[in-house]
Structures are given as structure tokens and as C-alpha cells.
Amino acid sequence: TGDTGLASQPFVAISKQARASVVNISSVRKHTRKSIGPDPFFEDPLFRRFFGEEFERRTPGPRDYREQGLGSGVIVGSDGYIVTNNHVVDGMDEVTVSLPDKRTFKAKIIGTDPKTDVAVIKIDASDLPVLPWGDASQLQVGEMVLAVGNPFGLSQTVTMGIISAVGRANVGIVDYEDFIQTDAAINPGNSG
């Protein structure tokens, strides 16, 4: 281990505890795009003159697509309950959870709330490490905070910042607003 001084030791300990309870969530939505007929671009006289009449005129048929999503979640029940953001799992056909120990599980969506952007999912596992909830009413502007997640699918990433504001409202994100604002780096895939 590196010796960066005593000041960093609490952050190392907190990071270890938090990372054990933060999971990577991969989601898939399957859909079929219907045929839309021939593309008018290929029927353009200039295009036909350049490529010739023998250019194959195809009518695209239905195609299957897989839309993939990434996010993070926090284990809140040792029996497999995980809290994430609603937008991570909303409308998805498959949700897969990867634990820090590299085990993967198919997850079941238990409940979602689009207004607060919160969702609960469950995996079939037991004896999982649980991250305890804090008391947001005790937070103060200027306190240091850590954010743990899977930005861009890079698992177990920890960033640090301070609490910039508490009780933030009127930002137009969701109907219910009482946000904690931080300057800790939050990237796509950290949601959850």
C-alpha cells in the first residue's frame, strides 16, 4: 500500500466499505424497427447516374435492435435488494447486476418511481454487504463526500468532492426536488 499520509486513511477505509456495496447494472431493451420502404436517397437521379441502374434497390425489412444501458446501484438488503435510479432500469427487458466480487445475477425489477427517479431491484443472493443509510438532514455545506459508481462501465470508481448545497430545488429535473449538490465527478454510468 502507498503511504500518502494519515489524512487520506479515513477516505481509504470509507472507499473500501462503500465499494463492497456498490454494484454495476447493465440493462437491455429489445425492440424491432419496422420496414420503412426504400430510401429516397438511392432513387435520386444523380445517385443513379453515378452508381448506375444495377445498384441494388433494397427495401430494408424489420430489424431487431438491442439498446443497452449502464448504471450503478447500492445494496440495501443483504438478501439482494438494490436501490438504483429509475432511468437505469425503466422499460428494460433484461437487467444484470455485477457484484464487486465479479459474480453476476439477473435482476428482477421490484418497483419504480419515475417522479423521484428511484427504483428497487432484486437479485437472488444472500449475505451481501449492505451500505448503511446516512441522515441527509445532518449534512452541511462544505463537508467532504465520496461518490462510488461505474462511470462508462468502469467499475468501482471513487471520486471526491464537497457538499455544495443541500435542499436544492427548482432545477426542473423531477417533480420532487430536495437535492444534495456536490462537485464530486459524476459521469454517465454513475446513475444509481
Give the positions of each predicted feature:
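Serine-dependent protease modules
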Residues: 1-192
